[in-house]
Structure formats: structure tokens, C-alpha cells
Curated annotation (Swiss-Prot):
GO annotation terms (biological process): translation
Superkingdom field: Bacteria
Record's protein name: Small ribosomal subunit protein bS6
Family from the record: Belongs to the bacterial ribosomal protein bS6 family.
Annotated CDD domains: bS6
GO annotation, cellular component aspect: cytoplasm; ribonucleoprotein complex; ribosome
Keywords: Ribonucleoprotein, Ribosomal protein, RNA-binding, rRNA-binding
């Protein structure tokens, strides 16, 4: 299993209940064939630049270990979610 780091930014007006639902959805995808090591919610922050006329976003960092196919499925689900402004998944060095 490889180690990965996921950062995703949600629209800042998303309610806490919806944020938790999304985190649970992403957590389910990861835990189907991996383990979550850490979830760090950074909260609302100003974006470095405007994205689709949005200036603020809710940042979340997730560190996890998983099989090689998990990031592809996670990426697909992050792209589909309307509340996600941006996301990035990187593989960490061994």
C-alpha cells in the first residue's frame, strides 16, 4: 500500500452537516481498500486566487494509505461533487 495526501476545498457556504456527509463519503471510498491516518480540517480560508467568482473555501487535509486504484476512484468522486472547488491527491515518498 502506498501513502497519499489529499487536500480538497469546499465552497465556504456549505453547511457543517453536508461537509460531514462528504467527508464520510470520501472516508468510505478510502477505507474500502485502505486506512486513514489523519484528517485535519483547516476551516475557512481565503483562496490564493478567485475560482469561479469564489474567494473563500473550506480546506480539509486527509493522509491515508491505500491500494493504487483508490486515488483514481476518489478523484472521480471529488470531480463529481458540486461542493468541491479544487482537490489534489499526491503520493508520498516511501
Amino acid at each position: 500500500m502506498n501513502k497519499y495526501e489529499l487536500v480538497y476545498i469546499l465552497k465556504s457556504n456549505v453547511e457543517e452537516e453536508k461537509r460531514n456527509q462528504l467527508l464520510d463519503k470520501f472516508r468510505g471510498i478510502i477505507e474500502a481498500d485502505g486506512t486513514i491516518e489523519n484528517v485535519d480540517e483547516w476551516g475557512n480560508r481565503r483562496l490564493a486566487y478567485e475560482i469561479n467568482k469564489i474567494n473563500e473555501g473550506y480546506y480539509t487535509l486527509v493522509n491515508f494509505s491505500a491500494a493504487a486504484d483508490v486515488p483514481k476512484e476518489l478523484d472521480r468522486n471529488l470531480k463529481i461533487a458540486d461542493e468541491v472547488i479544487r482537490h489534489m491527491i499526491i503520493r508520498l515518498e516511501k
